[in-house]
């Protein structure tokens, strides 16, 4: 007689539930990796000026690239009709077009894959009754977020097809922030499935979680500001550090050159880069304070180690940002900078989630 035959029914049910939870957690962490890759591939698409190479949105038929010489030429002719071609790539041949096309096509294909990798396992776990309590609506919300991101991506691309030679930087920022929020949501859901005993009293955990939440908010703002920098190509200007145009704090008249005033925060290259620099210092300072606060409150426990790890990632990201700036945004540096932004974000979410559970 096996151990399973003699085990109490309640114990068997508990084991089945634990296995289901582990499977759901593995699925969610896998989705987080896919979204991470999606953001990095999106960065490569932007840095190679590939984002406008596909001028139509075909959610189903667009999953396949052109399969004949005639189809490739037709796609190329479509691209030649938009302003970017004449302004940036008037000498591009078909081989060059195929290069940028495959970046954008791969980005969209990965988006479709993420949609399938979300919907099918969700349906499977739902029908098998293996979703943890309270997760059904949350996961439906995640699926809706993915669909919304597809629409926002096309809305962003449309902004560069008629009167501009690039996508609107504010739409790029919305696209990246929505991807970042989706990533945050997945990491939070996955991390929440790891149950451990409470180690921190509710009063101490609440205060520390408030600080961690402020850090997370600052990181999200910084990611949005980074998208504005990328959309304006502001990283290719003012390529000195720590001074910008010979000053740590640029003249107010230079920062407020455009009218109305709000336009400077999204259209003024100097202002956009300056605010990205300043918020980087803010994130670094808040993270350093979190380390002192956590270690002073809890000693050298698990939460302090997480805070130190987050500080290390933030410091590495600041150094990468400086290198990206002074080297005038080489592809490798731009991609590493974007990848590290998501690593910082994921660590910040995991830290906040653990504190919310008293760990």
From Swiss-Prot:
It catalyses: Fe(II)-heme o + 2 A + H2O = Fe(II)-heme a + 2 AH2. Keywords: Cell membrane, Heme biosynthesis, Iron, Membrane, Metal-binding, Oxidoreductase, Transmembrane, Transmembrane helix. It holds the Pfam family COX15-CtaA. Its cofactor is heme b. One of its GO terms (biological process) is heme A biosynthetic process. Heme binds at residues 276, 337. It is an enzyme of class 1 (oxidoreductase). One of its GO terms (molecular function) is metal ion binding. Its EC number is 1.17.99.9. Its main location: membrane. The keyword Acetylation does not apply. One of its GO terms (cellular component) is plasma membrane. InterPro entries: COX15/CtaA_fam, HemeA_Synthase_type2. Pathway: Porphyrin-containing compound metabolism; heme A biosynthesis; heme A from heme O: step 1/1. Catalyzes the conversion of heme O to heme A by two successive hydroxylations of the methyl group at C8. The first hydroxylation forms heme I, the second hydroxylation results in an unstable dihydroxymethyl group, which spontaneously dehydrates, resulting in the formyl group of heme A. Interacts with CtaB. Belongs to the COX15/CtaA family. Type 2 subfamily. This is Heme A synthase. It comes from Beijerinckia indica subsp. indica (strain ATCC 9039 / DSM 1715 / NCIMB 8712). The lineage of its organism: Bacteria, Pseudomonadati, Pseudomonadota, Alphaproteobacteria, Hyphomicrobiales. The gene is ctaA.
């Amino acid at each position: 007689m096996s151990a399973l035959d003699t085990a109490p029914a309640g114990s068997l049910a508990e084991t089945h539930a634990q296995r289901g939870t582990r499977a759901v957690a593995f699925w969610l962490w896998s989705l987080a990796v896919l979204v991470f890759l999606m953001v990095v591939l999106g960065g490569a698409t932007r840095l190679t000026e590939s984002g406008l190479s596909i001028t139509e949105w075909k959610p189903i038929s667009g999953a396949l690239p052109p399969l004949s010489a005639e189809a490739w030429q037709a796609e190329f002719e479509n691209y030649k009709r938009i302003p970017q071609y004449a302004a940036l790539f008037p000498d591009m041949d078909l081989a060059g077009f195929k290069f940028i096309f495959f970046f954008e096509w791969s980005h969209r294909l990965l988006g479709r894959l993420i949609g399938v990798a979300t919907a099918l396992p969700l349906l499977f776990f739902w029908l098998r009754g293996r979703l943890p309590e309270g997760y059904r609506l949350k996961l439906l919300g995640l699926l809706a977020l993915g669909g919304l991101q597809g629409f926002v991506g096309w809305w962003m691309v449309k902004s560069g097809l008629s009167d501009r030679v690039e996508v609107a930087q504010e739409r790029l920022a919305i696209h990246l922030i929505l991807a970042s929020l989706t990533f945050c949501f997945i990491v939070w859901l996955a991390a929440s499935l790891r149950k451990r005993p409470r180690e921190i009293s509710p009063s101490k955990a609440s205060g520390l979680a408030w600080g961690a939440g402020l850090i997370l908010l600052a990181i999200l703002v910084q990611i949005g500001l980074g998208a504005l920098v990328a959309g304006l190509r502001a990283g290719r200007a003012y390529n000195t550090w720590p001074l910008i145009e010979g000053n740590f704090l640029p003249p107010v008249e230079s920062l407020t050159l455009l009218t109305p005033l709000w336009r400077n925060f999204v259209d003024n290259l100097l202002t956009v880069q300056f605010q990205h620099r300043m918020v980087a210092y803010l994130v670094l300072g808040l993270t350093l304070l979190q380390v002192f606060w956590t270690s002073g409150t809890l000693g050298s426990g698990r939460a302090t180690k997480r805070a130190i790890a987050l500080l290390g990632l933030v410091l590495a990201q600041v150094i990468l940002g400086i290198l990206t700036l002074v080297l005038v945004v080489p592809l490798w540096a731009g991609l590493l900078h974007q990848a590290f932004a998501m690593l910082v974000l994921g660590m910040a979410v995991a830290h906040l989630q653990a504190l919310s559970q008293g760990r």
